[in-house]
Amino acid sequence: MLNNLLQQATSPNGRARQYAIEHTVELTNLIPPTVSYESGGHTLIIGPTMLIERITEPLSSMASITLLSVDGEPGTQSNLYYADTVEISGFLGAFSVNVENHGKRVNLAQAAIGGNTFDIVLDMSLNGLMSEEVPVPGYFPVGRGYPKLADALEEIPTLMGTFDKPKYFRLEPDLCAHSSRGVKGCERCVDACPAGALSSEGSEQTGHRIQINPYLCQGVGTCATACPTEAIHYALPNPADTQKFIERLLANYHQAGGEKPIVLICSSRHESYNVMALKVLPDNVIPVVVEELPSVGIDSWFAALVNGATQVLFAASRHMPPTIQRILNQEVSMAQSLLTHLGLPKETIDILYLESLREGMPVLCEQPLGLKLGDLIGNKRERLFTALDALAETLNAQPSVQPLSISAPYGTIECQASDCTLCMSCVAVCPTRALHPAGDSPALRFIEQDCVQCGLCVKACPEQALSATPQLNWNKAARQGVVTLHQEEPAKCLRCHKPFAPQSMITMLQTKLRGHSHFATPEALNRIAMCEDCRVVDMFEAMAHDPEQQLKY
């Protein structure tokens, strides 16, 4: 349907658009990793008694049908059950349903069909008993209005057997800024998931980690867009390949004589809406069809602008789940604040709600930016900053510091030098090595471009000497350069005079341990000011001089 519409365009831009689409090889995983669902067809229908008893006929081919009334009204069917409270968890082929009646808790599947779980749940209750904004596979909350009952009744009979679904994401724990050494930091991906597939597991003792349940994951992509380090990224295809596809699409469009290209990122799930939008938009609007809108991040948006695009739009709907709208709006607002600093219209990157097309055309930006950088290399942040620096140079933007919103993953770290003991707790938890030691002397150093504002360093500092400030430093050299936040002369060992630790740390330890039974004597207190080798030598010399002293503690 979409291809047919695009082929009908006869304008020069329309022909260039079709040439670009036909001559750009889409990069996708041919054999992606998958997860499998096993469904025997045991179906649970939840809702008011009168309603659920009426809709069993279209599902007569299912292995079994169990009815669960939520209004307590009497019914006529023998497979009808009642409950005061209901708890549902799971996914296609593995729905656990626990009900409580008169204070007694029961596994409904065991009571109704002699198994542990149901395979499919058709939920006719008004608000739905599972809260995920994007329903898990096998769960049909038609009482909430989507999907429609007719569509659910048509699909449910097909859900018997074994089904494979792609693993949409890759997780690289080494890049994750969520937790380190018992300290919790970034939780952007957990907050961004509308399907309930991500969670933080662990404890302060064992450490926390991000877990992705592949059976719940629906491939929405908000987590990948929100992740500042690319620890979690979309895999069908991966972000770098998507970016290359957009860059080559634009190159082919220009090669065919097209002008002022506008990239319209569309979801493959809503082809009819995409067609409606393209019917009213000009022929220089090029659709880029992806699985989900949020799977394409801010780095790809700006990569399009530095490769000839005059604007990047998202073909969105106000019927999308609230979390998807929130994350997309949050990221686009961030991009628009950067565009404003560059002196570009904020609509250069914008969300086009398809419902608004009834009211008129959106603001279209068609001023060429004069950049064609080609493939951008590096990780997500490196690609983004390459694009931003190129735009800043071309547009003669002021190399100043721009304050950003509190949620921004860009910024600086400030250190109160009078409180810092250079213990390096912050360095130990920093996931990107934005904070790092000097190596040859006691010093804390910082690279602003690498800081993701995860807050781990601030929480880990025992002296509360650090603070984080979200901002973007448009001075490339200053942003990429190494800054010394705090530096001291090293303390020298009292015996061998070897530099071995920051003087402030030695002073702090002597102050805190003075009066402790193990450091009651001046000699014992002085050992804190010795290097590790001399400390041992001094202890054994004291023991040799007075062997009974060690028994007095």
Show where each model-derived region lies:
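Short Cys/His-rich "knuckle" micro-motifs
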Residues: A197-S203, T225, A231-P237, A438-G439, ...
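Cysteine-rich micro-motifs
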Residues: P214-C217, G221, E448-C454, T521-V537
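Short linker/helix segments within small regulatory modules
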Residues: E204-I210, D440-R445, V483-Q487, T507-I528
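Long, compositionally biased charged/polar accessory segments in the mid-to-C-terminal portions
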Residues: V285, E291, T310, A316, ...
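Helix-enriched interaction subdomains in cytosolic or periplasmic regions
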Residues: M1-I21, E201-E204, H208-F245
